Amino acid sequence: MIIQGGMGAGVSNWRLAQAVSKTGQLGVVSGTALDTIFSRRLQLGDPGGHMQRAMGHFPDADMVDRILARYYRPANGSGQRPFKTPPMISLDTDQHTKELTVLANFAEVFLAKEGHENPVGTNLLEKVQLPNLYALYGAMLAGVDYVIMGAGIPREIPGVLDLLATHREVSLKIAVGALNGNRFYATFDPKAFLQKTLPPLKRPIFLSIVSSVLLATMMAKKANGKVDGFVVELPEAGGHNAPPRGKLVLNDLGEPVYGDRDTIELEKIKALGLPFWLAGCWGTPEKLQEAISLGAEGIQIGTALAFSKESGFTDAIKKLTIENIHKGTASVFTDPSASPTGFPFKVLSLEGSLSEDETYQERPRMCDLGYLRHLYEKSDGKVGYRCPAEPASVFVAKGGNADDIQ
């Protein structure tokens, strides 16, 4: 089986996932930032009526009405006013934000599954923890078949899926820069949230994205529930990469150098007895056969599908990138500091985009989305939020490291 990579935000959209799943492979939606994406689709008049069609199948019509009343704008005149941005999600987020996140993920998975009987997955980031309980529940209400997670160690997610499958209350330890070893948790009670007849749910298959035998072993043996398999990502994979093991060394271009310690011994992955897929420059028929010969179930493909007609990239981005590839001028840089997650990140050089330092420096510094804010415990015991996108003076005044905003 080929897994379509989960590329956020909005690149791996429902159209791409549906198209892939209709071929018999695993289409995957990205659950990252779906509350914002969903609300903007509604404010653009919901072209094609797809969001409202999906919402018509949600089990709580009152909840749907509340979201539509707040965000939907008729198509005529849409786009003339600034977008109404949803509230930033927080540790004790309000009911509206929960409803929006659940509905957004429900709609994306519902549409990806529409018109066929094949499985569909959702991809979430461990580094973007705060929305994940609500995102998972929304996806499960729509019948999601696979949950794929990386960008961290999602050790608690298998147990969360077990509980959500029976609408039981769940909690998730949240990474907070805490004083005196204090711990902080996000909680979610589906029964209190929905307060309707609860539909039967299935527990989706959980695949952990790993970059080492050590991490795969930890997930297989120490997760709080069943891990069903792995996506084994090599450093060549697109998007976020695991940092090299040991002291960070950069090459002449400023990219992280991966060494022998970063080589993944596939025989040891295989010995764990769980199915696995290979990712990171495996996207050819020949590499697929090689992966299978090494014991893999198949491969995960991202980049090639990112430039398909169904992906969420704009046509202009697709056209310019493909032209650059044909001219031999396309380049990808593994940037050790581009992502607020702290993980290396693949950056495609594209004229007029934030890949150019001049364009990046001209962008006003503001924190308007907040998905990658750093949580920390304040002296009064409450949780504060540092945002690498906010003005540098504000970030540093909250105790942030100036290097984290470059």
What are these regions (language model features)?
Residues 20, 291-292:
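Hydrophobic residues within well-ordered alpha-helices
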Residues 13-16, 35, 288, 306, ...:
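Ubiquitous "structural anchor" signal
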Residues 3, 227, 235-275, 283-286, ...:
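Conserved active-site-proximal phosphate/metal-binding subdomains
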Residues 1-271:
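Active-site entrance/lid segments in N-terminal catalytic domains of soluble metabolic enzymes
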